[in-house]
Amino acid sequence: MHEIVTLQLGQRANYLATHFWNLQESYFTYNGEEESPVDHDVHFRPGVGADGTETFTPRTVIYDLKGAFGTLRKYNALYELTEDANLGQGLWDGKEVIQQQTPISQSDYQKNLDAGLPAPKLTTETVRYWSDYNRLFYHPRSIVQLNDYELNSMIMPFEDWSVGEDLFSDLDKEHDLLDRDVRPFAEECDQLRAIQLFTSSDDAWGGFSARYVDRLRDEFGKKSIWVWAIEGGSRVSRQTQLKRDMNKARTIYSISPQSSLYTPIIDPPSHTLSKVHFDPHSEWHTTALISSAMESVTLPTRLRQFHDFESSLAGDDGTHKIFELQSSVTADDGGNRQHLPVKGPLTETNASEQGAAKSQAKFELDFTYDGRGSSNSHIFNQLQVWRGTNLDQDKGSVAQEDIGLSRKQRYYNSAPMFQSYPSHMFSGAKQNKINVLAALTASSRTAERIKVLETVAGRIIGVDERETLVNGLGEIRESYETGWSNDSDFNDI
């Protein structure tokens, strides 16, 4: 068994992770059904509920601010014990004055799930929190509310990178967060494979996650750490954008060298398609679109017969850890195969010696860049995952496309469009399925991105921190420039 422990840090991260967990739950099979190719034990843990029944809950720790959990309770129906109404007042004989915050009303969707009834269709009006479309029970240890800050507070906003850094330091000093929150899940694993971390990178959660990753690397040594770093893509004032860029610069400088995979994700993406319908102001919508790519590209980590995800990411030299997330989507047309707009090799593989720059795929959705960079970028390494299109149906074409590339085992299950997804997001989708080509790509575009952050850091950040940060970003940038300007050097590897 190769288990993965997940950490979810903040509101935007929890919107994305909730879609991820709902999709994992949709793969469950029950008595009499064919065994799923997905190994559920990778992300889920067995346990025992309060009444002695067996439970199966996500192996995750969910952090968020006060007021951000909506109607999600720490103790749910699986783990709560019925309170004894006849309990006395103990040693206190005086009057009690109980002050309670007005409870958040449960949505009709959650009420129907609890009652075992068909759930109504979700809308942007009915989804107020990420918990409004959550379909799973979590272990009480998974729910960690940080009471020092309140969601969307105007008095104490959780925006500055240093605020998150200081909050982690204070909490870790008081509670030892790894020992309290992570170790119980890690010690249950037969063989811990990786730690997956969802976070935002352009606000205070960037500082919080940076210090968390420091502790994780110290504690778990060479274990893989995969970071999905979400950043705002909506237009904001110049001052706000500069603050976000400073936060992003600090986050990528602090986390990317410590991680095995660091993927910046723009939410919402800058460019979309006419066949993709979503509300860019709804985090429920935008993270559903992101999850279609993120969940698909990590599918190999959950398959019973696939164990090469890390080696595929590492490529030839293992030096490139910052990856772009990209995808193309078509509707599942019930058997009439649609070709996705891709050029070059279609295998699930890392870039080969045959010339990575010549085997670029043209993706419809780019979740990492805004399209302003160079179109003539060089690919150092790429992992592609197909869902819903059986390439072996056209064996002659596949044989030609695979020349020079190692073949990997393929699974062709379409990506599910679950009930908690926004309806009609993908035009023409049938049977609640879509075909997806998703990819993680390490390319020279990263150098352009970091160069922009270097410029911002050099102009705005204080003198005490400026030299260290700018030089550190420069070293990261150089690793995405060196070695590709001369094609013969690459092909001689």
Swiss-Prot record:
GO cellular-component terms in the record? mitochondrion
Q: Where are the transmembrane segments?
A: none
Which branch of life, at top level? Eukaryota
Q: SUPFAM superfamilies this protein is in?
A: Tubulin nucleotide-binding domain-like
Give the residue range of the signal peptide.
none
- Where is the protein localized? Mitochondrion
Record flagged with keyword Mitochondrion: yes
- Alphabetical keyword list: Mitochondrion
Q: Which Pfam families match?
A: Misat_Tub_SegII (PF10644), Tubulin_3 (PF14881)
Q: Please cite one Gene Ontology biological process associated with this protein.
A: mitochondrion organization
Q: Which family does it belong to?
A: Belongs to the misato family.
Q: What does this protein do?
A: Involved in the partitioning of the mitochondrial organelle and mitochondrial DNA (mtDNA) inheritance.
- Output this protein's name: Protein dml1
Taxonomic classification = Eukaryota, Fungi, Dikarya, Ascomycota, Pezizomycotina
Task: Supply the gene name.
Answer: dml1
